[in-house]
A protein has these predicted regions:
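Extended active-site neighborhood of metal-dependent phosphoesterases/phosphodiesterases
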Residues: 72, 77-189
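Flexible, charged surface loops at secondary-structure boundaries
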Residues: 52-56, 155, 191
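N-terminal active-site segment of His-dependent metallophosphoesterases
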Residues: 1-72
């Protein structure tokens, strides 16, 4: 008999790089209007990943939003954290709308000034960037119109992970296009 798989699931880390600013009136207004601990996300993620690395979990499943608003610097920092965790655990990741800044409003704070001149990660670059944690082990994958993916991974003889990306339904809202639903249905039948 196969031992049961142990999975750890994390979602919505919203990693925010401190290089984007963590003080000043504009930052305080932004931070105070949100339940996220923006300035502390790095330390919170590090503590969680350390605990997971030292646990007996077999796989780590991470669902986006992994970055706060798609900021390239936040993705680069988050990937370094993933790389450290990956030395001890197998990771599977799926991105979401904040990972490519769907609202086109990335922000940087400097005192009383807020600016939007922040380099972001385009949706079609997310999967090459996170490839080793996404589609590398996929037995099936579906590329969306945004260049993001849903994918299937065989975790064991009897367990498949269906990682679904519902970034847009083609009507400006989160969801799936009809062809994507067909692919999902096909994967469920194969499982």
């Amino acid at each position: 008999m196969q031992k049961p798989l142990k999975l750890t699931f994390i979602a919505d880390t919203h990693h925010y790089s401190k290089t984007l600013g963590t003080s000043g009136r504009q930052y305080e207004l932004r931070s105070g209007s949100d339940q996220k601990c923006l300035a502390e996300t790095g330390e919170i993620i590090d503590a969680a990943f350390e605990k997971i690395a030292n646990s007996d979990t077999d796989f780590v499943l991470i669902a986006g939003d992994v970055s706060n608003d798609g900021e390239l610097v936040s993705h680069i920092e988050f990937k370094k954290k993933l790389d450290r965790l990956a030395k001890k655990k197998k990771i599977y990741l799926i991105t979401a709308t904040h990972d490519w800044c769907c609202d086109e409003n990335p922000r940087k704070f400097d005192g009383d000034t807020v600016s939007n001149d922040v380099e972001t990660m385009p949706s079609f670059k997310l999967y090459p960037f996170y490839e080793e944690y996404t589609i590398n082990d996929a037995i099936a994958k579906y590329e969306t119109h945004l260049g993001t993916y849903s994918y299937v991974v065989q975790l064991s003889d009897k367990v498949r992970l269906l990682a679904l990306n519902d970034d847009q339904n083609g009507k400006g809202r989160a969801g799936f296009k009809p062809k994507h639903f067909e692919w999902i249905d096909e994967q469920l039948k194969k499982a």
